Swiss-Prot record:
It is found in: Cytoplasm. This is Ribosomal protein uS12 methylthiotransferase RimO. Signal peptide: none annotated. GO terms for cellular component: cytosol. It holds the Pfam family TRAM_2. [4Fe-4S] cluster 1 binds at C24, C60, C89. Keywords: 4Fe-4S, Cytoplasm, Iron, Iron-sulfur, Metal-binding, S-adenosyl-L-methionine, Transferase. [4Fe-4S] cluster 2 binds at C156, C160, C163. Catalyzes the methylthiolation of an aspartic acid residue of ribosomal protein uS12. It comes from Xanthobacter autotrophicus (strain ATCC BAA-1158 / Py2). GO terms for biological process: tRNA modification.
Length: 449
C-alpha cells in the first residue's frame, strides 16, 4: 500500500503531526488507532512534514523491498522535518533503523500504541483543547468513508518458512466477537457500506479464545470464524473476507455467501500448487483436494470470485514444480492473483533451504505467471459481459464513476468504469449492465434510472 499522509483542519494551539502509513491493511488499522488517540488528545494532522511539529512513520518490515521503502520514508521525514518517531513492523528490528538513521527520536514495534503515544508526548506535549470536536465513535478512518478495514485479530500461529510475521507480531490473539461487532456496527451507522475483514489468519479467528462467547446486543456470539461472519452479515453492509487460510471449515462459509450475507469473494493465499514446494513452505499441500474444494465452492456459489497470492522462485523450485503452479492457475481459474518473487527475509527459516533460484529465473517465471494469470482473468471477466452487477462507486467522474463489483476489493483488484445518465455518489451501490471486459477491468452502463 502506498504511504498515506494525513490531514485535518488546523487548530490554533494544537501541536501538528504528520503521519506516514506504509504496508498492508493491518498496518493501516494500526495507524487508524494511533491517529484516533492523537486526535482525542488534541493533536492536529497535517499533510506536510515541513509544517509539522513531529513526524510519525508506521513502517513495514515484511520484505527487504518494504524495509527499503520504510528507510526511505524515514529519511525523507528527517530531511524535511528532523523530528521523527518510528513504529510498525520494522520497529521490531530497531538496530537496522538506527544504523541508517541514528537521529530518530524513538522506535517502537507493531501494535505498541502506548509506546508511540509516550514518544509523541515526550517530543511534543499535547495541548488539549476542550472545544475541539469530539472524535467520532468509530474513530479516525484513513480509508474513504464508504469502506473500512475491520481487524479481528493480531498475530499468527502458523509457521510458514518464508514468513516472519509471528516473530514481528506474535502468535494469534483474537478480539472477542462482541468487541468486533460493536466496532462494525458503529462503522455501518457512520456510513460505511463495505467491511473488509482482515487479520493475519482470518479463518483461525477465535482458536486462541477457545471460541468463547461474548455479549452483543441481546445475544451471545461465539468467537468463531463462521459465527462472526454470519453476525457481520446481519448489519446490512457488504462483508468481504481477506487472508483466509485454507482450513477445512472454510467450506461452511459458502452457505453464508449463497444466502447473500457475505460477499461471494474469498481471498485465500494458496502461495503455490506443487505439493513439494508447499511442504518446504510448511503450507497445506494437497493440490487435488484444493481443486475439488474449489469446484464444490463454485457449485454452491456460482458467482464466487477467488483471489490468491503466490510465490515464484522459492528455494528449490524446479521447472516442473513451476509448471504445476501454472497448470493450477488454469484449472482452478483463479480470478485475481498477486505474485511475488521470493526474497530472503532475515529471520525466515526458508533462508536455510538448499538450491536458491537465480534472480533471472525468478524474473522469467514471474513474467510467465503474470501472462498466464492475465489470460485466466480475461477469460473469467469476459463471462460477465451482458450481466448486471452491483457496483459500489469509489470515484465520481463527469460521465459517471469508477467502482467495483462484489468480486473486487479496493486497491488490489479490478474496477468498473460506469457510465450514468445522472450524477453518481461515492459509496452508492449501482446496478450496472456490463458491456465490455479487459484483462482486469470492466465497463458498463448504470441501469434503473
Amino acid at each position: 500500500m502506498a504511504d498515506t499522509v494525513l490531514n485535518s483542519a488546523p487548530s490554533k494551539a494544537a501541536p501538528r503531526i504528520s503521519f506516514v502509513s506504509l504496508g498492508c491493511p493491518k498496518a493501516l488499522v494500526d495507524s487508524e488507532r494511533i491517529v484516533t488517540r492523537l486526535r482525542a488528545e488534541g493533536y492536529e494532522l497535517t499533510k506536510t512534514h515541513q509544517g509539522a511539529d513531529l513526524v510519525v512513520v508506521n513502517t513495514c518490515g515484511f520484505l527487504d523491498s518494504a524495509k527499503a521503502e520504510s528507510l526511505n520514508a524515514i529519511g525523507e521525514a528527517l530531511a524535511e522535518n528532523g523530528k521523527v518517531v518510528v513504529t510498525g513492523c520494522m520497529g521490531a528490528e530497531p538496530e537496522q533503523i538506527r544504523e541508517v538513521h541514528p537521529s530518530v527520536l524513538a522506535i517502537t514495534g507493531p501494535q505498541q500504541y502506548e509506546s508511540v503515544l509516550a514518544a509523541v508526548h515526550e517530543a511534543v506535549p499535547p495541548a488539549h483543547d476542550p472545544f475541539l470536536d469530539l472524535v467520532p465513535a468509530e474513530g479516525v478512518k484513513l480509508t474513504p468513508r464508504h469502506y473500512a478495514y475491520l481487524k479481528i485479530s493480531e498475530g499468527c500461529s502458523n509457521r510458514c518458512t518464508f514468513c516472519i510475521i509471528p516473530k514481528l507480531r506474535g502468535d494469534l490473539v483474537s478480539r472477542p466477537a462482541g468487541d468486533v461487532l460493536r466496532e462494525a456496527e458503529r462503522l455501518v451507522k457512520a456510513g460505511v457500506k463495505e467491511l473488509l475483514v482482515i487479520s493475519q489468519d482470518t479463518s483461525a479467528y477465535g482458536v486462541d479464545l477457545r471460541y468463547a462467547t461474548s455479549p452483543w446486543g441481546d445475544k451471545e456470539v461465539a468467537a468463531r470464524f463462521l459465527d462472526l461472519a454470519g453476525a457481520l452479515g446481519d448489519l446490512g453492509a457488504w462483508v468481504r473476507l481477506h487472508y483466509v487460510y485454507p482450513y477445512p471449515h472454510v467450506d461452511a462459509v459458502m452457505e453464508l455467501m449463497a444466502a447473500g450475507k457475505v460477499l461471494p469473494y474469498l481471498d485465500i493465499p494458496f502461495q503455490h500448487a506443487s505439493p513439494t514446494v508447499l511442504k518446504r513452505m510448511k503450507r497445506p499441500a494437497s493440490q487435488e483436494k484444493t481443486l475439488a474444494r474449489i469446484q464444490a465452492w463454485r457449485a454452491a456459489v456460482p458467482d464466487l470470485t477467488l483471489r490468491s497470492t503466490f510465490i515464484v522462485g522459492f528455494p528449490g523450485e524446479t521447472e516442473a514444480e513451476f509448471e504445476e503452479l501454472l497448470g493450477f492457475l488454469e484449472e482452478a481459474e483463479i480470478d485475481r492473483a498477486g505474485c511475488f518473487k521470493f526474497e530472503p527475509v532475515r529471520g525466515a527459516d526458508a533462508n536455510a533451504l538448499e538450491n536458491p533460484v537465480p534472480d533471472a529465473v525468478k524474473a522469467e517465471r514471474y513474467d510467465r505467471f503474470m501472462r498466464t494469470q492475465q489470460k485466466v482473468s480475461a477469460r473469467r471477466l469476459k463471462r460477465k459481459v451482458g450481466t448486471r452487477q452491483s457496483v459500489i462507486i469509489d470515484t465520481v467522474t463527469p460521465d459517471g464513476g469508477i467502482g467495483r463489483t462484489k468480486g473486487d476489493a479496493p486497491e488490489i483488484d479490478g474496477t468498473v468504469k460506469v457510465f450514468a445518465r445522472r450524477p453518481l455518489r461515492v459509496g452508492e451501490i449501482a446496478t450496472v449492465k456490463i458491456e465490455a471486459a479487459g484483462p482486469y477491468d470492466l465497463s458498463g452502463t448504470a441501469v434503473g434510472f
